[in-house]
């Protein structure tokens, strides 16, 4: 999982990426290709 300051590029890397808020943190998750997971500080 990458930790990024901005998720703008992370959410457009793959068509199945989706932005989710969990416990006050913003995540990009990808069910089909978990390589593209990312988190914002």
Swiss-Prot record:
InterPro entries: Ribosomal_bL36, Ribosomal_bL36_sp, Ribosomal_L36_bact
Protein family membership: Belongs to the bacterial ribosomal protein bL36 family.
Pfam families linked: Ribosomal_L36
Source organism of this protein record: Hydrogenovibrio crunogenus (strain DSM 25203 / XCL-2) (Thiomicrospira crunogena)
SUPFAM superfamilies reported for this sequence: Ribosomal protein L36
Name of the encoding gene: rpmJ
Protein's recorded name: Large ribosomal subunit protein bL36
One of the record's GO cellular component terms: ribosome
Entry's Gene Ontology molecular function annotations: structural constituent of ribosome
Signal peptide start-end: none
HAMAP family assigned to the protein according to its UniProt record, in alphabetical order: Ribosomal_bL36
Keywords: Ribonucleoprotein, Ribosomal protein
GO biological process assignments: translation
């Amino acid at each position: 999982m990458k930790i990024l300051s901005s998720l703008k590029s992370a959410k457009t890397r793959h068509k199945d990426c989706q932005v989710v808020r969990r416990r006050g943190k913003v995540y990009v998750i990808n069910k089909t290709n978990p390589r593209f997971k990312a988190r914002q500080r």
